[in-house]
Amino acid sequence: MAFSLKFDDKKLSTSVWPPLPTLDDKKSEINKKINFITAVNILKGFDYEFKGTTYHFSFDSEDQSNFTQEKIRATKAVEDGKKDEYVAYWRGHVGNKAYTLQFNYDEFIDLLMFSGENKSQQLGTGWVLKDKIAACETKVEVDEMVKTLKIDELERAARDIVDELGLAIKVEDM
């Protein structure tokens, strides 16, 4: 804690204020923002073309779990020699309209791979941003890097997505 003492007309007054954040504190704060941005960009889902139409697929934690469960079912179909009989139904959206789509094994695996690639790309982008922040040696460099990487703009965009989709996620949770 920092403080000051002031004598004025035989009165003693004090002022106390919190310490300035350290370099590590500043980096940690920015990393929380990057984690938030990354998580939102994963959870917002992805667009995927299927049979000539581009659909939006949500990818919240429940959807990710469902993809994993369906992958197990698809793997079992192959193990049982029933790959050609495999069918998966999945919800895709165009605008505000939801469609139930039917995928055969190969089509579903393509969707599954695309979803994984999208998640991996978002994670990779977050790691690159964190590496750039980690390389900063002073608080001034951190501030400059935040501006260069447009972290504040990315965070605002992520907050807008959270509001639009009603996601229950906050920077403070990261």
Predicted regions and their residues:
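A preference for well-ordered globular domain cores
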Residues: A2-M174
